[in-house]
Amino acid sequence: EGNPSTTSDPTDGSGAWFWWSKEGTKVYKQLWNRLQDKLQDEYGLHNLIYEENLYAWSDSSAEWYVGDDRTDLVAYDKYNTQYNRHDGKTSGPNLDAETGIFYKLNGYVNGTKMVAMAENDYISSMSNMLVEHAYWLYFCPWYDSANALFVSGENYQDHDEMKALYNSDFCITLDELPADLFNHGDQPTTTTTTTSGTTTT
């Protein structure tokens, strides 16, 4: 009870492959707002972190953004081991940091929200993310299945690069979290964080 939980429903708005986005941005935003209001006002769920999945396919992609007051994070689903690569290859691990997409999403929110990689096939290399300043909040490889081994398969991951990322100071792993993480009371410290800095209020 009270533990934070991330939700991204309705997801993939601008993808238009789900029923909730086929009617366009207006209907999608109405559904997002209605669901959020119901979860908070009717069910009393105030521990949810709202994450909106966005894309960067065209100039109109930003129109799907639900607004600063309606989401806490923005995220991107990335699957491009086999296509849309920048290295000319069509298979094998793709270590690209997807910097262009990171900064497009950052621009949609004017630097006011953190940007995550909500789903992905490969994990970007640590060196590429650092050099290109693509500071994804987190990454979440799709699980292994009979169809694709997204985590353990060598066609998707460079396991040496994966180990380097997990062992770097840049990456926070579960064992590095405070043991008393959820025992600091009900009143959080209020801060405003943007790409230009953090202010405590």
Region locations from a protein language model:
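Extracellular mucin-like PTS domains
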Residues: 189-201
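Alpha-helical scaffolding within the catalytic cores
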Residues: 54-66, 96-105, 121-129
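Substrate-binding cleft of secreted/luminal carbohydrate-active enzymes
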Residues: 112-188
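Acidic, His- and aromatic-enriched active-site or binding-groove loops in soluble protein domains
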Residues: 14-47, 75-81, 140-143
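Aromatic- and acid-rich polysaccharide-binding/catalytic face
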Residues: 61-92, 140-144
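Active-site groove signature of glycoside hydrolases
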Residues: 1-22, 50-53, 69, 73-74, ...
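Active-site clefts of carbohydrate-active enzymes
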Residues: 2-8, 78-82, 102-130, 134-135
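Aromatic-lined carbohydrate-recognition surfaces of secreted/lumenal glycan-active proteins
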Residues: 1, 32-61, 112-123
